[in-house]
Amino acid sequence: MIPALWIAKTGLDAQQINMNVIANNLANVNTNGFKRSKAIFEDLIYHTVQQPGSKSSEETISPSGFQLGTGVRPITTEREHSQGNLSKTNSLKDVAINGNGFFQVQLPDGNAAYTRDGSFQINPNGQLVTNNGFLIQPVINFPANGNNMSVSRDGIITVRIPEQTQPIRVGKLYLANFVNDSGLSNIGENLYQETEASGNPSISSPGSHGTGLLYQSYVETSNVNIAEELVNMIQAQRAYEINSKVITTADQMLQKLSLL
């Protein structure tokens, strides 16, 4: 079998994965707090006919050697945690992070998760939750007669109570920060969980220890750049076509060999 067939096959597989990643980015262009991914590749092991620096004759040394590549493989999908644009909304419960950090969420099984999606709601128990009903941590309880919710830049939440002149504080939002954001595990529903690669979360007040500030009545939009993704898609398509052409050409070479 001509090695080019296998090499081109690895190229097809790689570009298919690349296209899947691009498609997911484009599918989530309107997802609040979504962070785009990119596929990372590496070349496969080389078949070494002659090592660089080895003797090519008794008196000469090969300056670059003779090594044949065997293809490519994907090694990771890297999440890019660059800032998305802040979009103005009409909801006092929407909160966007401008800078680093994640909101803390408690899952139904008690485990912790983290999100950049600050489109919050208040559940029937008067608690601040995500759109999926997951509790924001630490738990923030709103009085039944509270109104005019206000969120300060550093996360302090206040409401107004009838017949009281001053707003009352009902809680505070804290942000989790990680040494390696890309090491977080995506679990869907705009949520991440920590891993050994991400390191443990560092919990801080917004605006301190490298975390961003909060903006009420805003949501962070997806950081997907449609034009960039379309360019990447065209490049992936062309690479796929080229590898397909290699397979076709190698097949034609095999056919000619079989006639000899």
From Swiss-Prot:
Q: What SUPFAM superfamilies does UniProt report for this protein, alphabetically?
A: Flagellar hook protein flgE
Which cellular components does GO assign to this protein?
A: bacterial-type flagellum basal body, distal rod
Q: Where does the record place it?
A: Bacterial flagellum basal body
Subunit comment: The basal body constitutes a major portion of the flagellar organelle and consists of four rings (L,P,S, and M) mounted on a central rod. The rod consists of about 26 subunits of FlgG in the distal portion, and FlgB, FlgC and FlgF are thought to build up the proximal portion of the rod with about 6 subunits each.
Compositional bias (Polar residues) at which positions? 52-67
InterPro entries, sorted: Flag_bb_rod_N (IPR001444), Flagellar_basal_body_rod_CS (IPR019776), Flagellar_FlgE/F/G (IPR020013), Flg_bb/hook_C_dom (IPR010930), FlgE/F/G-like (IPR037925), FlgG_G_neg (IPR012834), LlgE_F_G-like_D1 (IPR053967)
Q: Keywords of this protein's UniProt record, alphabetized?
A: Bacterial flagellum
- Superkingdom is Bacteria
Which residue positions does the secretion signal occupy? Answer: none
Name used for this protein in its record: Flagellar basal-body rod protein FlgG
Enumerate the residue ranges of region (Disordered): 52-71
Family statement drawn from the similarity comment of this UniProt entry: Belongs to the flagella basal body rod proteins family.
Q: Which PANTHER family does the annotation name?
A: FLAGELLAR BASAL-BODY ROD PROTEIN FLGG, FLAGELLAR PROTEIN
Question: What organism does the record attribute this protein to?
Answer: Buchnera aphidicola subsp. Baizongia pistaciae (strain Bp)
Q: Which GO terms describe its biological process?
A: bacterial-type flagellum-dependent swarming motility
NCBIfam families, from UniProt?
A: FlgEFG_subfam, flgG_G_neg
